[in-house]
């Protein structure tokens, strides 16, 4: 879960940098983008897509979150595209053309943009592919609810979100089918259904106005985080293939 990653990283920083006061702030994607533009933060933890989008403002990555299951920082996250299982007419990406879709936020790389990128890879214009796209103001459960209730034909989320929401809402289990579901060792390790290529994971970045000495201490702290020391087995590495995000 995103909350597990955030809590693990921040708690580790607080424990290993006692001389640094860390003020936690939680933002939605659009709010964080505004905070970066205004220089209101020194560091941020965001998706690799968000990091790439913020590069023009001088941000630099100082670590990518990895786990025991996904030690390669270039291949950590994926998207899931899903429909109701009883929609026999929707079995492939091409079948989704002209349908209504729903996701969390148009600027969210993991929940929305990865899925739209997969549609482009299939040869379609993502800007004209769906008849309508609705958004839930960053509430993933409402994406699932809308597809379950038939208010939207297609849902787009980050991989593993669907399973997590189903676990909290058992009446939705076995109600959905994943479009273009990937199979193989990566899928087995992830333990979740997904529809897209994999991309770099959560990225810890520093702003250009942050003092270098402070950045050094934070970077050293991040790199000292070991899977065996964290509840969810997270560590920090460095992604090298942000070209896939573009």
Feature locations, PLM:
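Extended ligand-binding regions for polar small-molecule ligands
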Residues: 7-14, 84-87, 172-245
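Short, hydrophobic alpha-helical packing/hinge segments within bilobed ligand-binding/sensory domains
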Residues: 31-35, 140-146, 152, 161-162
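Extracytoplasmic small-molecule ligand-binding "clamshell" domains
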Residues: 1-53, 57
């Amino acid at each position: 879960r995103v909350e597990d990653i955030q809590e693990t990283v921040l708690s580790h920083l607080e424990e290993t940098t006692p001389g640094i006061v860390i003020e936690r702030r939680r933002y939605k994607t659009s709010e964080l983008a505004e905070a970066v533009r205004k220089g209101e933060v020194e560091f941020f933890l965001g998706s690799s897509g968000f990091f790439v989008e913020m590069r023009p403002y001088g941000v630099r990555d100082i670590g990518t979150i990895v786990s025991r299951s996904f030690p390669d920082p270039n291949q950590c996250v994926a998207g899931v595209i899903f429909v109701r299982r009883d929609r026999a007419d929707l079995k492939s990406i091409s079948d989704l053309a002209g349908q209504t879709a729903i996701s969390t936020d148009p600027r969210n790389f993991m929940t929305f943009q990865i899925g739209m990128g997969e549609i482009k890879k299939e040869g379609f214009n993502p800007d004209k592919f769906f008849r309508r796209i609705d958004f839930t103001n960053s509430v993933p459960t409402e994406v699932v609810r809308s597809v379950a209730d038939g208010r939207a034909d297609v849902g787009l989320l980050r991989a593993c979100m669907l399973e997590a929401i189903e676990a909290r809402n058992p009446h939705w289990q076995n109600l959905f089918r994943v479009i273009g579901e990937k199979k193989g060792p990566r899928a087995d390790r992830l333990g979740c259904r997904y529809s897209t290529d994999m991309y770099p994971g959560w990225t810890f970045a520093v702003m250009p106005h942050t003092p270098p000495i402070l950045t050094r201490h934070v970077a050293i702290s991040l790199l000292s985080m070991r899977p065996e020391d964290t509840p969810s087995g997270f560590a920090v590495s460095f992604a090298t293939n942000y070209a896939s995000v573009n």
